[in-house]
Structure formats: structure tokens, C-alpha cells
């Protein structure tokens, strides 16, 4: 068995569509090491988002296993999975999903509030990591698209996750701003593993490694 932070073995996922079971992932074997920045690429329907949902514990596989830092997350209860996900994984999406009425600081601090942590010093630290501490009192409408995505990244960092999952994080940004966001993600890998879904080959080449999916399998 690999000592990788993320270890998938024989990973399968199928969905019930009418009377039929449609398999989306067909026995994925994959290792991602601690401190890696990995891009997952593939055509629409190749299984990229399904794979990320399984790694991020937003869904369960129908076969195989996933180990995160040696813990088999496919065998734990749903309640345990929610708690493990909250402590282990941060998410960044194409859309920023910031609350318009809250400041940058308040948006970043939200996960801490839900976790019952009222200290919030971690929110300031996260904003500093994305170089936005000078904009902490600004609301989303007062920030550029790139700044809003930085706030979203800071929010994903605030619980100190082991894994950062980014699903098309530059899709709503122009080329230059997108490259700056990827450079920022690359700078985070000293403290965590970064896994990104992207259709952009140029941005994917900025990561350490590319995993190509085709028809629910890893393309060698």
C-alpha cells in the first residue's frame, strides 16, 4: 500500500438511472502524495467531478476504497464523514459563493463560526496568506473577481485542511488573473495537498502532475 496522502484503490461509482445502473468511474487506482499540486483533466463526462466528490467526501463510492492519510473514509458513518471532511478538506469552486452582505473577513470566518470557534484569528491569518489582509472590511461588490476568488481560497484555508480541492477555480477569471490564482495555489502546497479540476492545459502544466481521465478511467 502507498504512503500517499490520498490512496484510491479499485474506486467505482455508479448511479441509478431508471432501471439501469450507469457506472461513471471504473476501478480507479490512484495515489496523490502529501504536498503535491495535482491537476485532473478530461472531457465532460469523463468522471472528473465525480472523482473529486468522492475524494472530498461529498459522495460515497459504490466500490473500492479511498484512504486519506491512512484512514479509510469509505467505512465511516455519514456523521463521522461530515466531521472528517470539515477538519480535512477545503473547497474552492468556479463561482465564489461569497455572501454579499458580509465583508471579506466575515466570509472567511464563517467556517469557524459553524465550528463553534469564536477566536477568528485564523481568518486574519488566511487573508494574509492570500495577500488580502488590507481588504478585510470590503464586501464582495467592492472586490475584483480575482480578489473574490482569493477570499474564497482564504475561506477554504481557515480550518487548516490537509487537502484543498479546487473545481475550475479560474473559470470565471481572465487569463492573467487565472494564472495568478494558480500561482497562489502552487504556493500553498508546502502545507497541504492541492487537487484541481481544469480544462485549461496551460494552467494544468503549472501543477506538479496531471491525471487524465477518459470514460471513467485514468488514461495512461
Predicted features, each with a name:
Residues 5-210:
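ABC family nucleotide-binding domain
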Residues 210-220:
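H-loop (His-switch) and adjacent beta-strand-loop-beta switch element
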Residues 1-3:
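Short, Lys/Arg-enriched, disordered terminal segments
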Amino acid at each position: 500500500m502507498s504512503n500517499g496522502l490520498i490512496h484510491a484503490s479499485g474506486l467505482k461509482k455508479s448511479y441509478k438511472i431508471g432501471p439501469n445502473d450507469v457506472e461513471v468511474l471504473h476501478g480507479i487506482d490512484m495515489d496523490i502524495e502529501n504536498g503535491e499540486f495535482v491537476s485532473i483533466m478530461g472531457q465532460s463526462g469523463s468522471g472528473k467531478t465525480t472523482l473529486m466528490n468522492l475524494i472530498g467526501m461529498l459522495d460515497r463510492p459504490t466500490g473500492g476504497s479511498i484512504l486519506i492519510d491512512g484512514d479509510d473514509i469509505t467505512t465511516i458513518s455519514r456523521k463521522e464523514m461530515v466531521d472528517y471532511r470539515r477538519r480535512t478538506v477545503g473547497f474552492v469552486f468556479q463561482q465564489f459563493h461569497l455572501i454579499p452582505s458580509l465583508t471579506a473577513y466575515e466570509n472567511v470566518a464563517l467556517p469557524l463560526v459553524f465550528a463553534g470557534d469564536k477566536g477568528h484569528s485564523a481568518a486574519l491569518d488566511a487573508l494574509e496568506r492570500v495577500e488580502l489582509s488590507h481588504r478585510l472590511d470590503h464586501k464582495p461588490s467592492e472586490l475584483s473577481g480575482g480578489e473574490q476568488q482569493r477570499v474564497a481560497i482564504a475561506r477554504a484555508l481557515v480550518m487548516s485542511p490537509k487537502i484543498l480541492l479546487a473545481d475550475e477555480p479560474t473559470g470565471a477569471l481572465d487569463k492573467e488573473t487565472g494564472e495568478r490564482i494558480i500561482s497562489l495555489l502552487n504556493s500553498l502546497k508546502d502545507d497541504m495537498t492541492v487537487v484541481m479540476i481544469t480544462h485549461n492545459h496551460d494552467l494544468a502544466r503549472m501543477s506538479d502532475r496531471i491525471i487524465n481521465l477518459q470514460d471513467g478511467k485514468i488514461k495512461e
